[in-house]
Every structure is written in structure tokens, then in C-alpha cells.
């Protein structure tokens, strides 16, 4: 799981997954775009990279590997809500990990909901913190 916006992180992760035939799911939690728009951007980047490297992978495999969930966008890009702020607060207090409402905090809150809604239990889960630390300081006023 990770925050997906422009799609480049997701495209890179999926390229690695496809090239090395890794069966694990890579789920991008959209922080701004609806799935249909973001999905095509990611697919285009994957196709471009694989073509440049002369690696042949079926369109069907590529399409099956791009998982974007846009259910947790919330009020919009760069806008948090109390649930996202609570997630940021908990991660900072309990784990010492700063997050922001635009990217990582929103995606982490979305991941928690995704896991619960999809009944994922007793599984190893990886969340990739892709940055956004400077934006964390914008959230300080909400972390009291």
C-alpha cells in the first residue's frame, strides 16, 4: 500500500512486480484522482518503460496488476478531515512517524479502511511511506 497521485511510484512498483513475477498485490490508495483516470496514466507509464527495455508482458497481465482504490480520496486533493488527522496523530504518538494529510496520512487511513472492508487478517502488510514530511508541519495545529 502507498499513496498514488501522479502514478509514477505505482508504475515503478508494478514494473518490478511484472518483471520478477512477484505474486503480491500492490494497492495504490488514490489521494486525488478517480480510478479510471489514474489507472490509464499508470498503464501508459508501465507500457512505455517495458517497451523501452524491450520486455514483453501481455496487456492482460499489466492491467490485472494495476490496483488503485479511489474510495478514500475524502474531501479532495490536499484536504484532510478528522479521520485522516486522527490517523496522523496516532502514527506520530505511537510510532514516531510523521505523516501529512495530502499523501501518506490520507493513504494510511485509506489502507486501514481497505484492510477492514476487505476482511484482510493475519497477513503481512507493507505500507510504503513515500514522503510528504514537509507537509506534516502544516498539520501541527491539528495534532494537539
Spans of features found by a protein language model:
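Glycine-rich phosphate/pyrophosphate-binding loop at beta-loop-alpha junctions
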Residues: 1-67, 128-144
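Active-site-adjacent helical/loop segments in soluble small-molecule enzymes
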Residues: 62-122
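Generic beta-sheet signal
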Residues: 123-127
Amino acid at each position: 500500500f502507498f499513496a498514488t497521485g501522479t502514478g509514477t511510484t505505482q508504475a515503478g512498483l508494478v514494473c518490478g512486480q511484472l518483471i520478477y513475477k512477484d505474486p503480491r498485490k500492490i494497492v495504490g490508495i488514490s489521494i486525488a484522482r478517480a480510478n479510471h483516470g489514474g489507472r490509464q496514466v499508470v498503464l501508459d507509464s508501465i507500457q512505455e518503460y517495458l517497451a523501452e527495455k524491450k520486455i514483453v508482458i501481455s496487456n492482460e497481465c499489466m492491467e490485472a496488476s494495476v490496483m488503485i482504490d479511489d474510495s478514500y480520496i475524502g474531501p479532495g486533493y490536499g484536504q484532510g478531515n478528522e479521520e485522516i488527522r486522527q490517523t496522523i496523530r496516532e502514527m506520530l504518538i505511537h510510532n514516531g512517524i510523521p505523516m501529512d494529510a495530502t499523501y501518506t496520512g490520507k493513504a494510511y487511513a485509506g489502507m486501514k479502511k481497505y484492510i477492514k472492508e476487505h476482511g484482510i487478517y493475519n497477513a503481512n502488510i507493507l505500507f510504503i511511506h513515500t514522503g510528504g514530511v514537509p507537509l506534516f508541519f502544516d498539520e501541527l495545529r491539528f495534532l494537539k
